[in-house]
């Protein structure tokens, strides 16, 4: 069982993958989506097949007041595109403050600002996926 974590953005898509047991999330890569969403979706298809992905957890942008905005609509369109890639569950995960947490973590690790741009999306995908993995692990214990 492998679960894919995605932080979708108009310019970049952060990607993370779970370990085979579904306990931990590891950053996989950042895919540029600004120039060609079609190429980005093709790369995701390759990853899904390579890792035999059973579930995809995608960061779902909700405003701080709980409403949906333009980013939510774009994410919904992206979800429609990836839902055609295979047989897997797609889980929408509240991503509020994920990018803030990713920046905070990178600051604590001493990562320079010039390097953050290429890492923040993948780090956000890791945080999204790990949040989901922690939730399902907690549900299994109950």
UniProtKB/Swiss-Prot annotation:
This is Putative pre-16S rRNA nuclease. It holds the Pfam family RuvX. Its main location: cytoplasm. GO terms for molecular function: nuclease activity. It is found in: Cytoplasm. Its EC number is 3.1.-.-. SMART domains: YqgFc. InterPro entries: RNaseH-like_sf, YqgF, YqgF/RNaseH-like_dom, YqgF/RNaseH-like_dom_sf. Disulfide bonds: none annotated. It comes from Ruminiclostridium cellulolyticum (strain ATCC 35319 / DSM 5812 / JCM 6584 / H10). SUPFAM superfamilies: Ribonuclease H-like. Belongs to the YqgF nuclease family. It comes from the Bacteria. Could be a nuclease involved in processing of the 5'-end of pre-16S rRNA. It is an enzyme of class 3 (hydrolase). GO terms for biological process: rRNA 5'-end processing. Keywords: Cytoplasm, Hydrolase, Nuclease, Ribosome biogenesis. One of its GO terms (cellular component) is cytosol.
